[in-house]
Amino acid sequence: VPPHMHGYYPTSVSYPSIVGEMLASGFSIIGFSWICSPACTELEVVVMDWLAKFLKLPEHFLHATEGPGGGVIQGSASEAVLVAVLAAREQAVCRVRASHPELSESDIRGKLVAYSSDQSNSCIEKAGVLAAMPIKLLPAGEDLILRGAALRSAIEQDVTAGLIPVICIATLGTTGTCAYDDVDSLATVCEQYNVWLHVDAAYAGGAFALDECSELRRGLERVDSLNFNLHKFMLVNFDCSAMWLRDANKVVDSFNVDRIYLKHKYEGQTQIPDFRHWQIPLGRRFRALKVWITFRTLGAEGLRAHVRKHIELAKKFEVFVLADARFELVAPRALGLVCFRAKGENEITAQLLQRLMERKKIYMVKAEHRGQLFLRFAVCGMDPKPSDIEFAWTEIGTQLTALLAEQEHLAAVGKAGDVTELTQQFGLQLTNGTNEKSQ
């Protein structure tokens, strides 16, 4: 990603990852089961446990521990969320059919409902469309955080109406402002109503590895599944999204479609999973190889340093914003994202962005919250530097100065035009009055 691309969350890349991608392409493995490529499956088990320990996730998400939990590499957060939604849906259908045999499957499916925040990513709403299950986007609080109280209120209303709550998708690092939903309070409600809780930590998950960001991990021991994009913070190129499940059997049981040509004598063993049951497609790429090479080359401290660099550079940009009275923050800086706007009407911010896009020196996108238009500045690039931040801020400040000067000039011209018009009208009236007196 170019260092002056600040519109979206970063898409990482590194030379070790590129080498791993090239090797994986050369091997051309379609690792849907252990028997077709033991190395593909076993290396993925290893790196997913490495990553879980690196991010300090609860032990029940590790393959190495006793229990049905484990991790798998999906292509994207969209795939991971869809897998969670589909698995939760099938589990709910089975559970309700067992307790209410008088209901038909179609009756049950027509009553299913899911929940997320109105600040969540579009892929969550799309997962509901693909799963034929409505996802209600609950209003986040003034601080952009979804809490258990809002979820409880929605579930109570739906249960009273005869609906069946299925899953809640919480977000750690929302797309608009990088807000963090209150996972702990959401988990309390989900446990009470037997609702699957999934956490989409596509961006913020990289900060789990930092001791200073330990608060982000609060409540993760209570969730059923979570995902994190390695291609955002971990210097692994797209596509590569890690997903962990507390009980992988719930996904396997929901997606298991066997054929005789797919069976082998080792299937069913917990230490050698057939990952085809953990995902949407049958075939799968050897993504674990680029993760393994990147981790081995850069090391845990190298990856932590990369995340910290993004955070420090965002702090630098935040200082620039706070020091300029013409700008204001819309939300607190979060990790490598700063949300800000030009003070005044939304039109000023919109015109500022238009000028920046026309000049093509930096790239940003706009977002909106509570009727306020704002700009998102995300630190990006394989090796971002302070000079990149300074360049971007200089460009933004210069263009706002030019925009305000242009508006002042137009306003002055408008006032001058009004005065001229009034003078002409007044002069015409004086002339007419003089002529009448002469006559």
Curated annotation (Swiss-Prot):
The modification N6-(pyridoxal phosphate)lysine is found at K232. Its cofactor is pyridoxal 5'-phosphate. GO terms for cellular component: cytoplasm. GO terms for biological process: amino acid metabolic process; carboxylic acid metabolic process; catecholamine metabolic process; chitin-based cuticle development; cuticle development. GO terms for molecular function: 3,4-dihydroxyphenylacetaldehyde synthase activity; aromatic-L-amino-acid decarboxylase activity; pyridoxal phosphate binding; structural constituent of cuticle. InterPro entries: Aromatic_deC, PyrdxlP-dep_de-COase, PyrdxlP-dep_Trfase, PyrdxlP-dep_Trfase_major, PyrdxlP-dep_Trfase_small, Pyridoxal-P_BS. CDD domains: DOPA_deC_like (cd06450). Belongs to the group II decarboxylase family. This is 3,4-dihydroxyphenylacetaldehyde synthase 2.
